[in-house]
């Protein structure tokens, strides 16, 4: 869960991973 995946991101990043 780093943010490279919108469903698995813990933080809002360029990958779209939002908590």
UniProtKB/Swiss-Prot annotation:
Keyword Coiled coil: yes
Gene Ontology biological process: adaptive immune response; blood coagulation; innate immune response
Domain comment in the entry: A long coiled coil structure formed by 3 polypeptide chains connects the central nodule to the C-terminal domains (distal nodules). The long C-terminal ends of the alpha chains fold back, contributing a fourth strand to the coiled coil structure.
Record carries keyword Membrane: no
Job description of the protein: Cleaved by the protease thrombin to yield monomers which, together with fibrinogen beta (FGB) and fibrinogen gamma (FGG), polymerize to form an insoluble fibrin matrix. Fibrin has a major function in hemostasis as one of the primary components of blood clots. In addition, functions during the early stages of wound repair to stabilize the lesion and guide cell migration during re-epithelialization. Was originally thought to be essential for platelet aggregation, based on in vitro studies using anticoagulated blood.
Keyword field: Adaptive immunity, Blood coagulation, Coiled coil, Disulfide bond, Hemostasis, Immunity, Innate immunity, Secreted
Reported modifications of this chain: Conversion of fibrinogen to fibrin is triggered by thrombin, which cleaves fibrinopeptides A and B from alpha and beta chains, and thus exposes the N-terminal polymerization sites responsible for the formation of the soft clot. The soft clot is converted into the hard clot by factor XIIIA which catalyzes the epsilon-(gamma-glutamyl)lysine cross-linking between gamma chains (stronger) and between alpha chains (weaker) of different monomers. Forms F13A-mediated cross-links between a glutamine and the epsilon-amino group of a lysine residue, forming fibronectin-fibrinogen heteropolymers.
A GO cellular component annotation in the UniProt record: extracellular region
UniProt main location, coarse: secreted
Coiled-coil annotated residue ranges, if any: none
Compartment list: Secreted
Name under which the protein is recorded: Fibrinogen alpha chain
Superkingdom classification of source: Eukaryota
Subunit (UniProt): Heterohexamer; disulfide linked. Contains 2 sets of 3 non-identical chains (alpha, beta and gamma). The 2 heterotrimers are in head to head conformation with the N-termini in a small central domain.
């Amino acid at each position: 869960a780093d943010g490279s995946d919108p469903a698995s991101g813990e933080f809002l990043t360029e990958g779209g991973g939002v908590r």
